[in-house]
Amino acid sequence: MAHLEQFGRVSRLSYSRIKEPVELPNLIQIQKNSYDWFLEHGLREALQEVFPISDFTGNLELGFLDYSMGEPKYSINECKERDVSYQAPLKLKVRLTDKENGEIKESEVYMGDLPLMTEKGTFIINGAERVVVSQLVKSPGVYFNERMDVAGHPLFGATIIPNRGAWFELEMDSAGLVYTRIDKTRKIPVTVLLRALGYESNEVILDMYDGDETIARTLEKDTSTNKKEALIEFYRRLRPGELATEDAAEQLLKNLFFDPRRYDMAAVGRYKVNKKLGLNIPPENRHLTLEDITATIGYLLKLIKGEGKTDVIDHLGNRRLRSIGELLQNQFRTGLVRMERVVRERMSIHDVETLTPQVLINIRPITAAVKEFFGSSQLSQFMDQTNPLAELTHKRRLSALGPGGLTRERAGFQVRDVHHSHYGRICPIETPEGPNIGLIGYLATFGQVNDFGFIETPYRKVDKKLGRVLNEIVYLSADEEDEYYVAQANAPLDENGYFIEEKVEARYFEEILEIPKNRVDYMDVSPKQVFSVATALIPFLENDDANRALMGANMQRQAVPLVKTEAPIVGTGLEHKAARDSGAVVIAKKAGTVKKASASRISIEKDDGTIDNYELLKFMRSNQGTCYNQRPIVKVGERVEANEVIADGPSTEQGELALGRNVMVAFMPWEGYNYEDAILISEKLVKDDVFTSIHIEEYECEARDTKLGSEEITRDIPNVSEDMLKNLDDQGVIRVGAEVRPDDILVGKVTPKGETELTPEERLLRAIFGEKAREVRDSSLRVPHGEAGKVVAVKRFSREKGDELPPGVNQLVRVYIAQKRKISEGDKMAGRHGNKGVISRILPEEDMPFLEDGTPVEIVLNPLGVPSRMNIGQILECHMGWAARALGLNIATPVFDGANEEDIFTKLREASLLESGKTILFDGRTGEKFKHEITVGYVYMLKLAHLVDDKIHARSIGPYSLVTQQPLGGKAQFGGQRFGEMEVWALEAYGSSYTLQEILTVKSDDVAGRLKTYESIVKGENIPEPGVPEGFKVLIKELQSLALDVRILAGDDHEILIKDNDNEGNEKEKARELGLDLPDNPVGRMLEITQPIENAEQDVELKSSPK
């Protein structure tokens, strides 16, 4: 039955029928736990693997005793301001022992800085917030596979994959012989390897495998008869062309598999091998053993006889997660190994008397490895900070790409597909559309990572004898779960936990079966354990098609934080948890009473009388340029409990996630303005700032040292009117609060110009005024084309004040410009069910369709967008939202355990609305009734980050490409619109030859023609005939580079010479006369000119002959 439930400070009418026996875990613990493991264990493991380091004689030994972390130099916010990393120094306590004279030197050595994880599970690297994504990789272990030969007979194979070291493979050929390959080299009969390992005679080998005929056949093919021959044969195959000796072969074999420094299958590899082959080798033993090799061969022989099972590589029992801790440990180990080499060399070179640990240890390889990992690894990503949900899901992202993983091109359908072992571990819905589909996934809500890196999911234990579900929770990994029957979370139970029905629906491998209740082993803890956080935020998910649910989950992450936030009327109950764990809201550490609450700080007096201060972030710029702002939701004198939300962040309301707004929607066509998913909205949404968002852009200007002198930030800029300088302070930096438009000066800066030959007049001035007359050019920071707004903050850094700046930079000024963007035509909007569209028209409020009581609807959506897309959830949300708004309720309808149709009808009746959820609407323009009843209700709509202001673009004069001399493309390059092949056809179809000629020549890449045309426009003359486009010249040059003798001949067969851009000087003069300033560097020139072509009017044809 529906019941009221409290979510933080908000109560919702919840329709959930299932009491969840286990709380949701902290949603970013995957990041935090992994990094904590690294600091406590991973770092020590890596250090113990490399230390102690001995020199080549064995006299000197550098051992490691302990390590400690210092305090970070700056706070998190200071790091963001100063563009530095949030990190702490790592110090090692080491001991240098001289074994000859027994001398011991102990000291503490600084080992560089290690980036620290913030409370929110992120890292600050060079001032930018970054996330390290967990990687899904093939687990170390032993794998058996099966393929078909040409005749259709099964061929089996086996591979032992280590964490690091050589791969050991076994394979069959169609003759039924077993071969081995080591590290993808040439294959050798497996019996050669067995002999080399010490099983010399045929009898011993046959005995070991009970006279197996496959082995007997392989022995016939084997030419070696004893260990020595086998070793030499083995060495020849692995190192062809080198001299094979018994000792070298023995050493090679030992190094390949039995040396812990070169071969490591990690604890997880040992666990997998023991489990698959039924061995009991202790977990400390992480290299291969004889037992591993013989048991692997044994299992392969069993497979040939039809016993045992092959492995599916996409099963989550065979794929594990490498999270931040392990990734960083591997990187750190790489650095340590490089350092070890340096230490050894220094031990041999330096004098023993003067040696100290500080002299030996070179930390550069370590700091370089760590820096490289955080700065440029594929898995260390710039955090998606569009809204709190985007932050949260980015930290829970699982990627199969990256170093040691898959590549997009090689990944087939098999790897990308949903597998039954994903249940409760990886979300089957949320994944990107496009080339990464299925390679990037998201952790399911209850998923956790065990010590081996496998994802586990919780289940309730079932007492089979009684048929009763217990409240005992067991976490199972994918391979452990395979042996059990698992019932669904919504299997009917009585109040004591007994199954009501005799037969229960349960999962077993990929099948869903109906089985007697006494065969059930476990039961799901919650219906939402299958899905990720973003998917579990979609109400009525069970009524949506999976493809649209995927779009809904992905688009919630793109919702822009609005100025006025509003939590959804129809939610799923997960909004509170998602907002809390994202780190966007402020949470009270201890209980107490609010003493002071202002916009920027909350003070709470704890029960022991001391005061906790919480600083709030105000109008900060997020990574994506959205506005990050926190505001208090507690009042002075209010009692606050520990872990209670006391301030809202972006996209939250009363501690709940609030990505969009609840708006009244009608599903009807309107004059074709909602054709093809377009959206018609009311002007009310613009006027009332319903979908208004704030966007903050950062611009920076640095004054550097140049060869000709230092740049200077100043108000004194040459050739600039006083009007342009009116908002600059006396240093030449814009004041906070100024409204700026494109091309306004933000920071005045001048750069020294190169000395040129001075005229006599200039020499006289120089003599009178001294240095002052030195030429400088204006290199001020200006507002880019198409941007505008208000200056909200200015930050200044200078070397003189002791700020850390990059080399060569003396001063740095950052200016932040905020824009208030109201919703407008061309903006993209979406619901939570994958129903997205672009706003096509904003209608005056009075013209919108209205209800019988005169209320105009706010948005009109096209009903044809629903049936074919099969996302009926939006209609149910619309009905439920209307009823809930009328009754003044908030609803929680969890996924697969929420309100059904009957509940919706009941609520509509309660609210005195028609059970159909439809009503009569009137046309706002004429006042007439529409013919049919129309579905109306409240839907939660989001404004997405694809805003028209960022996409719209126009160009007049701009940069040209250097080679083709055609305008560049794209908004970022201030490019033009390409008039391509198909567009040319369109003009050809109309026969508009002059328009076409103009587009393909003077408006594009006829360099001389461009300038002449500009000249004639300036002088008011007729526009001259176009010349030959630069692209044509490039084509000729390309053909000539292929050794084709290509020339242009006129109608009377005499050659027309094409001039190159060598006559630049006088054309620059001409351009200057016209008031055009041509830059000196050719890349990105505004206008380029070359020699005009003679005889261009003549008939031109292309003739080619091979040279």
Curated annotation (Swiss-Prot):
Keywords: DNA-directed RNA polymerase, Nucleotidyltransferase, Transcription, Transferase. Residues 1062-1081 are annotated as: Disordered. Its EC number is 2.7.7.6. GO terms for molecular function: DNA binding; DNA-directed RNA polymerase activity; ribonucleoside binding. One of its GO terms (biological process) is DNA-templated transcription. Belongs to the RNA polymerase beta chain family. The RNAP catalytic core consists of 2 alpha, 1 beta, 1 beta' and 1 omega subunit. When a sigma factor is associated with the core the holoenzyme is formed, which can initiate transcription. DNA-dependent RNA polymerase catalyzes the transcription of DNA into RNA using the four ribonucleoside triphosphates as substrates. This is DNA-directed RNA polymerase subunit beta. It comes from Syntrophomonas wolfei subsp. wolfei (strain DSM 2245B / Goettingen). The gene is rpoB.
